[in-house]
C-alpha cells in the first residue's frame, strides 16, 4: 500500500504545495489548510479519554462523542478541530500529523459525504470524520467506509509531510553530515539524524523512523541499514 499512499500524497501536494515535490522543505500544513478554506480550532476537548485527536466537519451542526453527548455545538462546515491535549500528551509532530490527516479527508473524502447526503442516508459519521491516529482494532473485513477512510488518511498523512522523492535527498545529506556508515557503531549519530529530520519535517521521531524504513532503510540491532531497497 506504500505506493498508493505515496501516489495520493503526491496528488495532494501537486495541487496544494508542489514545492515539496521539488526540494526538501518543511511542509506548511497550517497554511495549506487555510488555503483549502479550512479553519483550525484548538480549544475544545473532543473526547473524555483523548481517543479522538481531531476531526473535520463536512456539514454544519452539533458534534457528538461516541456516547452521543454533544461536545461541540453549531460546528461549521470546513472546520478542523484539534483537541488541545494533543500538544502536551503527545507531540507537536502529532498535531501536524493530525492537521495533515484532516486536510487529506477534506481533499479526498468529501464525495462520500456528498453521495450519502444525496441518497438521503442518515449518516452521522459522514457529517464529520473523527480521527484517532491509531490502528483500527477491528477485523478489516468488518470495516465500514469510514474505517477505510481513516486507514487511508493515516497512511497518507506522513507522506504529505515527508514526501519520499525529496525526503531521500534530505536523508542522504544528513547521512553525510553525521558520517553515518551503518556499521553498528553509529547509533547515536542516527538518533541525531532522526531528531533533526523530526524537527525539519514537523513529525514525531516515531513517524520519521517509519518513513525512513519505508524509504528503504531496515532497522537492524537498533540502527537503520539499507537493504536492497526493501
Label every PLM stretch briefly.
Residues 1-230:
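Active-site hotspot residues in diverse enzymes, especially metal/ion-binding acidic/histidine motifs
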Amino acid at each position: 500500500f506504500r505506493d498508493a499512499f505515496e501516489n495520493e500524497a503526491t496528488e495532494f501536494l501537486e495541487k496544494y504545495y508542489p514545492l515539496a515535490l521539488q526540494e526538501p522543505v518543511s511542509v506548511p500544513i497550517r497554511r495549506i489548510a487555510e488555503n483549502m478554506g479550512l479553519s483550525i480550532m484548538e480549544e475544545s476537548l473532543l473526547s473524555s479519554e483523548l481517543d479522538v485527536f481531531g476531526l473535520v466537519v463536512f456539514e454544519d451542526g452539533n458534534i457528538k462523542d461516541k456516547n452521543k453527548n454533544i461536545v461541540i455545538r453549531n460546528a461549521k462546515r470546513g472546520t478542523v478541530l484539534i483537541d488541545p491535549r494533543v500538544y502536551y500528551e503527545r507531540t507537536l509532530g502529532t498535531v501536524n500529523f493530525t492537521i495533515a490527516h484532516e486536510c487529506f479527508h477534506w481533499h479526498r473524502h468529501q464525495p462520500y459525504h456528498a453521495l450519502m447526503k444525496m441518497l438521503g442516508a442518515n449518516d452521522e459519521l459522514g457529517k464529520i470524520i473523527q480521527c484517532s491516529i491509531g490502528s483500527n482494532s477491528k477485523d478489516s473485513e468488518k470495516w465500514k467506509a469510514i474505517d477505510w477512510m481513516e486507514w487511508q488518511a493515516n497512511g497518507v498523512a506522513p507522506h504529505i509531510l515527508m514526501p519520499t522523492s525529496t525526503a531521500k535527498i534530505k536523508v542522504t545529506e544528513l547521512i553525510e553530515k553525521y558520517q553515518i556508515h551503518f556499521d553498528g557503531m553509529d547509533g547515536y549519530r542516527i538518533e541525531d539524524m532522526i531528531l533533526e529530520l523530526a524537527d525539519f519535517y514537523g513529525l514525531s521521531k516515531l513517524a520519521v523512523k517509519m518513513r525512513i524504513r519505508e524509504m528503504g532503510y531496515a532497522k537492524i540491532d537498533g540502527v537503520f541499514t539499507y537493504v536492497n531497497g526493501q
